[in-house]
Amino acid sequence: MKTLSLKPSEIEKKWILIDADGLVLGRLASQIAMRLRGKHKPTYTPHMDCGDNVIVINAEKVKLTGNKRQDDIFYWHTGYPGGIKGRSKGQILDGRFPERVIIKAVERMVPRGPLGRRQMGNLRVYAGTAHPHEAQQPEVLDVAAMNPKNKRSA
């Protein structure tokens, strides 16, 4: 039997909606990364963008286990001497763009290259419940029901 290799015309992309309310960040990010890459499909082809389009809502309500909310820090450098800066995940979640925490977590689970960048373009993350993709009729994926560890109450 020959190995299946999809052609661009055979790729079928679906739209998936995930509610991040109360979900653990790392477990959520790994599910999103798998869906973006298309590894959940039997027709997965490593060199093609065969993953689905993923919409994540309620990004500000994502949970972090342990002390990661204050201990995990995103660093960057301004380019000036002594210009190292940093913000904790908690500060970012409480700030203006809480969706960046999910985007960064998924970005680090997807390959770094031209294909990975194209796959990351299929991810849309929104802080609240509203999203402009109702016309695509996304199907809801319940990540919390997959494993009890995926959801945190407190």
UniProtKB/Swiss-Prot annotation:
GO molecular function: mRNA binding; structural constituent of ribosome
Disulfide bonds: none
One GO CC term on file: cytosolic large ribosomal subunit
Lineage: Bacteria, Pseudomonadati, Pseudomonadota, Alphaproteobacteria, Rhodospirillales
PANTHER family to which the protein is assigned, alphabetical: LARGE RIBOSOMAL SUBUNIT PROTEIN UL13M (PTHR11545:SF2), RIBOSOMAL PROTEIN L13 (PTHR11545)
One biological process term in Gene Ontology: negative regulation of translation
Protein name as catalogued: Large ribosomal subunit protein uL13
Keywords attached to this entry: Ribonucleoprotein, Ribosomal protein
InterPro entries for the chain: Ribosomal_uL13, Ribosomal_uL13_bac-type, Ribosomal_uL13_sf
Subunit structure: Part of the 50S ribosomal subunit.
Top-rank lineage group of the source organism: Bacteria
Protein family: Belongs to the universal ribosomal protein uL13 family.
Its job: This protein is one of the early assembly proteins of the 50S ribosomal subunit, although it is not seen to bind rRNA by itself. It is important during the early stages of 50S assembly.
